């Protein structure tokens, strides 16, 4: 074999070996990452269960603020609904643009 063909063959073998080793390494990393998924999930579920048993007081301040805001917004919306129902009672009927009345079915 000529020198050029030997160099080409050696380079091809090195590139092939590097590719095989690289793919094997990536597969091992992915396998380890997939293995960590259920472990992290179990830890997250356990932390959530502990937070529930300890009550709402264990929430961080930003979550407490957001929860309080949502509760106050909900109360405000309930008051607005009562106010508007007194002004215009809800009948459960839907009137189309043709004037046809469609009753809603109870679920």
UniProtKB/Swiss-Prot annotation:
Domain of life: Eukaryota
Keyword terms of this UniProt record: Mitochondrion, Transit peptide
Pfam families reported for this sequence: PET117
Annotated S-S bridges: none
Gene Ontology cellular component annotations, sorted alphabetically: mitochondrion
UniProt subcellular location: Mitochondrion
Gene Ontology terms: biological process: mitochondrial cytochrome c oxidase assembly
Entry function: Involved in the assembly of cytochrome c oxidase.
Alphabetized PANTHER family for the sequence: PROTEIN PET117 HOMOLOG, MITOCHONDRIAL (PTHR28163:SF1)
Family indicated by similarity: Belongs to the PET117 family.
UniProt-recorded name of the protein: Protein PET117, mitochondrial
Native source species: Saccharomyces cerevisiae (strain ATCC 204508 / S288c)
Name of the coding gene: PET117
